[in-house]
Amino acid sequence: PTRRSSDLTRDLCEIHIGMPTQVFEETRGERGDVPKPERAGKLADVFNRYAGVSYASPGAVQLEKSLIRWMGDLVGYPAGAAGDLTSGGSIANLMGVVAARDAAELKGNQLESSPIYLTEQVHHCVDKAIRIAGLGECPRRIIPMDAGYRMDAEVLAATIQKDKSVGYKPWLIVASAGTTDTGSVDPLETIADIAAFHGIWFHVDAAYGGFFMLSDSARDVLNGIQHSDSVVIDPHKGLFLPYGSGAILVKDGASLHKAHYYDAHYMQDAKTN
């Protein structure tokens, strides 16, 4: 006999509640489990708005812009910053790497002499983003860490100087603000100074630690994040929201636009509305 959908929903909920996850035992999920996002998600499904352009859904686009502006203010970015809500840190890091790549105007024959600087503690999605962005031929300089699993800024500076002395053109530093393994935060202020001195794009993966900017006791640890060129931050981590909700923030909004904007004839009204 046909079962009612309410019966099926109840059965699925009972099965789910009774099955701990393989990653975090004795919990119903890895992240948030709160009712308000569930209700908001249902409303979004009911209205079913396309929020890719303002004229299609001005309210939804303005809501996203307001969220991006709030997060930009949180990390200390200026009014000209831009961003995008994503499905999580993987896509957000990819968008940041692509924005950095296009800002550096890298060409195929330049990749082998254009190093990227990071540590072994960087999230694996950054390596994936580098490959997907067509940057697999760029030398990856794995910078040693101190006893607290933080990037050694002195070694970073020396490595960059060495690369430049042989004609290489450093273009990207990836720092972590809350690593997955240890929660460590790289010395962002010092790294920002090094990046600015050499004219290198400074990207911070703050998917785990970024929202600790809301904490008076932890904010100082993240000092320097405001000097980065791009930041990844995940609401489904620091704000305990359900999957998937990530964000990419770019200080120079024009760089994000340049890297990800495309046009089409059928979208002509988007320019005038």
Q: Language-model features: where?
A:
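Short, small-residue-biased leader/transition segments that mark boundaries at the very start
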Residues: 1-5
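PLP-dependent aminotransferase-class I/II
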Residues: 87, 110-114, 118-175, 182-190
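Catalytic PLP-binding core of fold-type I/II PLP enzymes
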Residues: 155, 184-216
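Active-site C-terminal subdomain of aminotransferase-like
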Residues: 179, 223-273
